[in-house]
Amino acid sequence: MLHVTRGVWGSIVRVWPLLPSFLGHSRALSSLEAKMGEYRKMWNPTEPRDWAQQYRERHIPFSKEQLLRLLIQEFHSTPAEKAALEEFTAHVDFCTLFHYHHVLTQLQALYDPINPDRETLDQPSLTDPQRLSNEKEVLQALEPLLAQANFSPLTEDTLAYALVVHHPQDEVQVTINLDQYIYMHFWALGQRVGKMPRKSSVGSKRFFFKSPPAERRYFKRVILAARTKKGHLVLKSFKDTPLEGLEQLLPELKVRTSTLQRAILNVTLIVSGVVFFVNVGMVVLSDLKMATSLLLLLFAAFMGLRAAKMFGHRRSAQALELAHMLYYRSTSNNAELLSALVLRAQDEHTKETLLAHSFLARRPGGAKGPPEETSQWLQSEVENWLLAQSGCDVAFNGKRALAHLQALPPTVGMYPPPGLPKLDLLATLSSPKSAPSDDNSLEKPLGPAQPSHLVGN
């Protein structure tokens, strides 16, 4: 359960005004606390209200190689059809490569001035308005990329649920001050309900009687974009994150001891204190003729030190548990996240194009006909097929997949071209000992020119 504290300047979370279209409605603390209050009044909620409408899974739960094998088995079983599909896949990879490389280059150029992990020489520091403006551009550029990567944004109601509900098997609880944040936003994909993949964790065997892992709702990937008033834009990606544990991913948090754990520690202190006072205190009082008030004062000081030590040790163990969890769940940060996100968007782009190509090939008339009717047919067919193959209810974007397919250049050739140098050949060309005498031979392009059509928008 999240413990929320208020700042001295009021109870409003000021959402960055430069991002109205990106962050949606203003996330005021009053609105968020109202929804949190509603969840506190519920008896043991297990998921956000209207969860099926709030979150729709859009991620295709197969890798490109797995999808190719499934499509070949069902739709391209003959050797000629298999070869044609593999050739088409190479064509899609080649065309999308240029587009997403261009997208990554633009993102890196936008992010470089505000990159907190830059290893190059320091540049002149930016003013706060300049930094906010750069962050706005980066986040606006990430919005369509996240959509193409099939991440789904988590709503404010979902965030309120995650901040209130604490799963009994989560030993670590945290405290944050919402007034310290300018904005925070979460995206997720790969919703699962089941036993989470569990790494060895500190303190997981502290008790003899420990309930087995329960089935939980978690996400295979979660992306966080948050900024504190005294910090910078934080971009992080995590794996295998439970819905009730989103608050543990935020920066500027403090570990706290739960009410149950505090009660257990207090009872332990009281029982041990009474035993100590009866067995030791009474002997000291009778043998040393010490005043009762002085003995009680010394006893209170001793118990205070013991309580501080016990609670401090407990918080240290929980902080170590939290650090251990974040170490194993973190997948990429900041600039590295941009590269990983572009690769994921390119992969989802390719898979959507392959599905559109394979399904429209078996439709009478193919892609001919009204685009709206074609995209609806494609969406329905692919969603039913994915449900049958994976058991996952995926919301497939038929309109976007059809646009990807139609944006491809018509020519399908051999990719990479036969004349494209290999890495070992490049090393040979760069060696002065093996350099050819004809300098003009080095001026030949190492690859084909960029296609005139950029795939996707």
From Swiss-Prot:
Keywords: Membrane, Phosphoprotein, Transmembrane, Transmembrane helix. It comes from Bos taurus. InterPro entries: DUF3754 (IPR022227). The modification Phosphoserine is found at S316. Residues 429-439 have a biased composition (Polar residues). It is a multi-pass membrane protein. Disulfide bonds: none annotated. One of its GO terms (cellular component) is mitochondrion. PANTHER family: TRANSMEMBRANE PROTEIN 143, TRANSMEMBRANE PROTEIN 143 FAMILY MEMBER. Its main location: membrane. It is found in: Membrane. This is Transmembrane protein 143. It comes from the Eukaryota. The gene is TMEM143. The chain crosses the membrane at residues 264-284, 285-305. It holds the Pfam family DUF3754.
